Regions:
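Eukaryotic partner-binding/assembly regions in large regulatory complexes
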Residues: 1-3
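Short alpha-helical segments that sit at the start of domains
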Residues: 9-44
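Amphipathic alpha-helical segments within well-ordered protein domains
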Residues: 40-43, 58, 62
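Short acidic, hydrophobic short linear motifs in intrinsically disordered regions
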Residues: 48-61
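Short amphipathic alpha-helical interaction segments
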Residues: 64-74
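A short, conserved structural fragment
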Residues: 77-88
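Short, cationic-aromatic polyanion-contact patches
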Residues: 87-99
Length: 99
């Protein structure tokens, strides 16, 4: 198995561990590498080029986990979302991976 296959296998394992069958996040990972995998998946809920008011960001994130403030902060701090004056937009993450 090459390193790309191994990385994909580890990523899928993290997603299975932290998301339930309905696509809800069971817990926010404490380990940074695992949290990045989870945040990448959450960032896919946002369309590149679209601007989102905070209320819409909260709605989209609440469908995944109740701690929307923590998720917003992590997404911004890790470069998956940008934020200015209460408006958010996608700045990173995987684009072609199905949600």
């Amino acid at each position: 198995m090459d390193s790309g296959d191994e990385a994909l296998r580890r990523r899928e394992q993290v997603l299975r561990t932290f998301f339930d069958d309905e696509g809800r996040l069971t817990t926010i990972p404490a380990k940074h590498a695992k949290r990045l995998v989870v945040l990448d998946r959450l960032a896919q809920r946002f369309e590149p080029g679209e601007r989102y008011p905070e209320t819409e960001v909260n709605r989209l994130l609440r469908s995944a986990h109740d701690d929307v403030a923590a998720l917003r902060r992590h997404l911004v701090d890790e470069g998956f979302l940008g934020r200015e004056a209460g408006v958010y937009w996608r700045t990173g993450g995987t684009v072609d991976d199905p949600v």
